[in-house]
Amino acid sequence: MLLFDFLDVIGFLGPYIVFVISVIQLYSYSYYLYGYLVIVAVSQIMNTTLKLIYKEPRPSGARSILGERYIGPEKYGMPSGHAQTIFTSIMYLYCVTGKLFWLYLEIFIACLTVFQRWKFNNHTPKQLFVGASLGAFIGYVGYLMNYYFIGDRYEMYMNEKNYLLE
């Protein structure tokens, strides 16, 4: 039982774990790191806004893992914030780095997260699916926006700066 309890905690903390992994992996890609921090904030704002628009309640009988209480917009379950956040991070990091090891590790953590949210009756499968799909979409669009609108300008700025220092 102890192993399953541990995996439940990993699942609950999954978005935070994947966030830390992403920040560490993106540290050497500075403009992608800044873009990531912005896109995660945008994803959170979108999640709260959608919860207030749809007002779809969480399933009855939800269990708490660490004593969390769901008040305000968090009392609504559509879309799942855990699923949305973790899949935003997964998609963005993979698009930037293309590293399969981190993709597989983060997908494993995402599976634990989605399962934990369902097992503890915090979300319906539909809420989890919508959160994961929306998160992957936000991560991909965020990557594209960063690549096309910021990346080229950042590279030109850095090349100019290096030229002036020579």
Predicted regions and their residues:
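A cytosolic-side transmembrane-helix exit/cap motif
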Residues: 52-62, 123-131, 148-157
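Short, surface-exposed, charge-dense and proline/glycine-enriched linear segments
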Residues: 87-96, 132-138, 154-159
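Hydrophobic alpha-helical bundle signature of multipass membrane enzymes
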Residues: 1-78, 84-119, 140
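Membrane-interface helix-loop junctions and terminal tails of multi-pass membrane proteins
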Residues: 66-70, 113-118, 122, 136, ...
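Alpha-helical transmembrane segments that form the membrane-embedded catalytic/substrate-binding core
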Residues: 82-86, 123-147
